Amino acid sequence: MTASQQQIQLARRPQGIPVHEDFRFETIPVPEPKQGEVLVKTLYVSVDPYMRGRMQDTKSYVEPFALDKALSGGVIAEVVSDGNHLKKGDIVIGNLSWQEFSAVSESALRKIDTSLAPASAYLGILGMTGLTAYFGLLDIGRPKEGETVVVSGAAGAVGSTVGQIAKIKGARVVGIAGSDEKIDYLKQELQFDEAINYKTADDIQKALQNACPDGVDVYFDNVGGPISDAVMNLLNEFARIPVCGAISSYNAESEADDMGPRVQSKLIKTKSLMQGFIVSDYSDRFSEGAKQLAEWLKAGKLHYEETITEGFENIPDAFLGLFKGENKGKQLIKVSDPS
């Protein structure tokens, strides 16, 4: 094993859309595991839109990344040194630094079963991504058979799972995405009833009206911004709006840039519920969600797409691509193969 490795640090806080200069590659020693720790080798790294918020030094639901320190997130890794409970060769998942090797407490890692699904799936549909879709839609959205569910960011990892769960529940599903390829994916592969390319639609409001002639009962909001403003005009009485993300405004340079139409009057008139949520709120029910997702996956009711970028050095590029809509499904970076 080499004595040194690469680590990716936050070099500066982004102004608007992140750029390569916001990241720094550092050569650091491979750590020696202490008592209760194991050494793990990074196999896959997950990059997610929420990480953009952590790059700012502002109060949020999770601590910001520190300047000149490693960024971190969901990682699939291989144990390369025996511990008390984990053994060399075990494949594990954890929230780890963006580096090639890490010394980690065994309690911070969870062994995964790669006989049920490929390791990468545990960062996507069987991980936080799938659980976000599951709890956000079913606990807040509560779709009923025959209702119309609209999903923005529908070809992304969360959105595509939301739409499929809504179909399982008997809803009519309309997805919003940003390319013809993604529209075909939603309609042909995932069986969405309608899909709208917001980048080519002449009038997003009219396109939504045509796709939702009976109005909108559930809107799973992944993007915020003008797309969400248009959906709000079509809410039915007692509509439910789980607010999962606001990727359209993550790169706003000030709060003023994030200002849009006021929705209070629409919520009052339709007696609708709009609720933000964080998947960690449901941590005591993760086993419930994971079990159901695995059953649906095994039964062929859920399908998932991954965009896998090769190479540790390409982690920043993969992250930046999230904000350009370059990924279809879950964006991952493959760093290495198991031994």
Curated annotation (Swiss-Prot):
Induction, as annotated: induced by stress due to exposure to 2-methylhydroquinone (2-MHQ).
GO biological process terms held by the UniProt record: catabolic process; response to toxic substance
Top EC category: oxidoreductase
InterPro entries for the chain: ADH-like_C, ADH_N_2, GroES-like_sf, MDR_fam, NAD(P)-bd_dom_sf, PKS_ER
SUPFAM superfamilies: GroES-like, NAD(P)-binding Rossmann-fold domains
GO molecular function: oxidoreductase activity, acting on the CH-CH group of donors, NAD or NADP as acceptor
Residues that span the membrane, as ranges: none
Entry keyword annotation includes NADP: yes
Keyword Isomerase in record: no
Domain of life: Bacteria
One Pfam family hit: ADH_N_2
EC number in record: 1.-.-.-
Keywords assigned by UniProt, alphabetized: Aromatic hydrocarbons catabolism, Detoxification, NADP, Oxidoreductase
Gene3D superfamilies xrefs: Medium-chain alcohol dehydrogenases, catalytic domain, NAD(P)-binding Rossmann-like Domain
Binding site for NADP(+): 156-159, 182, 198, 222, 244-250, 277-279, 327
Role according to the record: Putative quinone oxidoreductase that may contribute to the degradation of aromatic compounds.
Homology family: Belongs to the NADP-dependent oxidoreductase L4BD family.
Name under which the protein is recorded: Putative NADP-dependent oxidoreductase YfmJ
Upper lineage: Bacteria, Bacillati, Bacillota, Bacilli, Bacillales
